[in-house]
């Protein structure tokens, strides 16, 4: 497990209310577009657990301000960064093309590698991960080992609910 191996450490959130609103607005715009175009994506938002050691194993540093346009570009099919997860810290995209250990839990056949990876990371840290299915455009959140299907119209509300959970 990551915590036992000290690959995840704790940190405090430093976002103001306005910055948090900006984060949520940018993610909502990106997820709405990714879903509409059935562009597969896995986006992890760090909460208090620092994912640096995981990123450094497989990811590509980005270190750019979060914007819907940049997320859409990263996940555009065929680009070198579109496979794997993108990790957001605060309002910055810090890494892309990060590969997570998938969950070992049995899932029904309708879930692919993105969903398994998103559940896997949520089992070992407190991050909140957004998954957009390439096949259906459906959106899910993963948090603490749970996969939560979310209609796009309810994304902002559901995201806030899990983002603010302790």
Show where each model-derived region lies.
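Divalent-cation
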Residues: 2-166
């Amino acid at each position: 497990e990551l915590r036992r191996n000290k690959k995840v450490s704790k940190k405090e959130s430093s976002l103001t209310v306005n910055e948090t609103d900006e984060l949520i607005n940018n993610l909502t715009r990106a997820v709405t577009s990714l879903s509409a175009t059935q562009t597969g994506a896995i986006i992890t938002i760090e909460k208090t657990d620092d994912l640096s050691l995981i990123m450094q194993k497989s990811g590509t540093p980005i270190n750019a301000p979060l914007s819907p346009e940049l997320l859409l570009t990263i996940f555009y099919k065929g680009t070198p960064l579109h496979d794997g997860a993108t990790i957001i810290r605060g309002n910055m995209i810090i890494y892309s093309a990060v590969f997570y250990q998938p969950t070992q839990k049995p899932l029904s056949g309708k879930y692919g590698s993105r969903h398994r990876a998103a559940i896997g990371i949520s089992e070992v840290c407190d991050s909140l991960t957004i998954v957009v299915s390439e096949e259906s455009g459906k959106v899910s959140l993963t948090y603490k080992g749970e996969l939560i299907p979310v209609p796009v119209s309810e994304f902002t509300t559901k995201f806030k609910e899990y983002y603010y959970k302790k």
